[in-house]
Structure formats: structure tokens, C-alpha cells
Amino acid sequence: PREMLSDAYEAAGVTETLARWLDGRMIRLVTVDTIDSESWFSADDREWRANRQEAYYEYVAEEVVPFVRSLSDWTRLPVSVGCGFGGTHAAILFLRRPDLFAGLISLAGSYDAKTFFGGWLNARLYDNSPLDFLPNMANEHPYIEIYNARKMVFCTGQGEGLDESRRTTDLLRSVLHERGINAWVDFWGADVDYGWEWWKKQLVYFLPYVLGR
């Protein structure tokens, strides 16, 4: 789907899949609507679309994350998690503000914004395109130390609907290696398609690693 609404996780059965973590109060799941139909998948002016994506990023980083932290007396930082294009958003948020998060799980994300803008890129979209801003990050940038203090997962399958995710995840793996950034980059098999069936399995598989359990 091109628009991921906040009830998608519950509708897909993710709350049931993660019940033991939720019921045991090991995690709290907070989901957020996207506006991808106005940004990544719109036919409108490209600069306006890029501005909409930046506004979404700022909303989550500056309003949603503080709200999430206010819900609990836990001192732990939240984990940025997303599936499909939600994985793209989760990665952008984490890579731009690793100080806000304890870790990242990006499933079936795509990391080259230019693909969705006909090869076009401006300064605003650059900030939302990990395959553009990460290669230019200086080796001494303080975020690299923060990245390496966190647990990051980038996972994609090699089945239907995942060509762009597979392509950009492979490129991202190379960039992370070149920058000396540690991450778990995992490619599942050719039978692993785009969709909740596999994302739920991947969440169960990777969540203990990111939570340190």
C-alpha cells in the first residue's frame, strides 16, 4: 500500500505476533500514520513533495518521539521500526537522529529517494536519501560513534515486490562498510515477498537482538 495508517499493525496481526513482548511490558508499540501519497508517491511538484517528506520527518522527530517518551517512566530510548516504506521512514529517522533512538529495524525499506523523484534531488530531498547523505558523512562525524553504540538491522527479502529494496539495501551495505558503521544487513530468500506475512516473522526474529534480550 502507498499509505501506511497507524492501525495497519493491528489489522495485520502484529499485535498478536508480538503479544508476549507487549503483555510482558517489555515493549510498547506506538504507530504513526504516513503521508506518502503527498510525498513519495505524489504526481505533484517535486519540491513540494520533498518539503512534505521533510515536514513528516520533523513531525515524528520533534513531536512524536517526545510524546512516546512521555508515555512511560522507562529511561530507555525507543527503537525505530518500520516495514515496507515504513522501513524507509524508520531508517531516515534513525540515521538522521541516532541520538533519539536505541536501535533500528528497517524491513523491506528503500534508501535512494531519487528513484521516487525521477532522478531529481535537491537539498531537502538529499537529507531524506540515505544513499546520498551517508556516503558524504565525514569519518569523524559524531553520529558514526553513536551508530556503532546502537543496534541496527536492515533486512529485505529477494522475492516479489522487493527489487528496489534489494538493490538499495545492497548498496547501503557497501556504504555502511566503507564508513565503518556496524549494522546487521540481512537478505532473506527468493521466497520472501513484500508483505506482512514475512515482516511479522522478521520482527520476531530481530526484535530480541535489538532489545538485547
Question: Which stretches of residues belong to each language-model region?
Answer:
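Non-catalytic cap/lid and distal C-terminal segments of serine-dependent acyl enzymes
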Residues: 1-213
